[in-house]
């Protein structure tokens, strides 16, 4: 049975740890789908350290945008995080919010057609007030609308 869970909060608020704990409550063999773009060797080492710290029971997947490329049917999967996932589309579409949002929604719908338990982790970046930076305001809008869309599908 498909299930969508959305975990949101501020930066460093414990969202990922909470999501991992929730996944462990639901299965002994969870999937961790990380959406971060690996920019350099230092970050690659950080990713490897996080994978090792999660333990051997986890299936680790690195995927910047096309989550639906991965068959997670029948699994419990933590998607961490929506903010970085949106960033990847935002950069691909040259900061065009409408195009980015359309692509994110399309990929979300395609990915979540699978019969799985999806635990999406996202940041609430809009609580910090309105930025003076136009690019940041555009991204905050994209993030907020994406969070609303995922929340509308969540159980």
Named regions from a protein language model:
Residues 3-7, 30, 75-84, 116-120:
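Generic beta-sheet signal
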Residues 1-4, 11, 73, 98-102, ...:
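Catalytic phosphate/metal-binding cores of nucleic-acid and nucleotide-processing enzymes, i.e., regions
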Residues 19, 50, 78, 123, ...:
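Residue-level signal for inorganic ion chemistry
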Residues 37-40, 83-84, 124-127:
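Conserved nucleotide-binding/hydrolysis micro-motifs of P-loop NTPases
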Residues 4-71:
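Conserved P-loop
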């Amino acid at each position: 049975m498909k299930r969508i869970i959305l975990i949101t909060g501020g930066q460093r608020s414990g969202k990922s740890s909470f999501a991992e704990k929730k996944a462990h409550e639901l299965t002994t063999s969870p999937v961790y789908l990380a959406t971060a773009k690996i920019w350099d060797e230092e970050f690659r080492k950080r990713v490897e350290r996080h994978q090792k710290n999660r333990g051997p029971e986890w299936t680790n997947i690195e995927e910047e945008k096309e989550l639906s490329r991965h068959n997670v049917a029948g699994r419990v999967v933590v998607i961490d995080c929506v903010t970085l996932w949106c960033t990847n589309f935002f950069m691909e579409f040259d900061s065009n919010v409408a195009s980015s949002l359309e692509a994110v929604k399309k990929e979300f719908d395609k990915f979540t057609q699978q019969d799985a338990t999806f635990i999406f982790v996202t940041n609430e970046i809009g609580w910090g007030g309105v930025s003076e930076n136009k690019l940041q305001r555009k991204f905050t809008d994209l993030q907020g609308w994406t969070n609303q869309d995922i929340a509308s599908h969540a159980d």
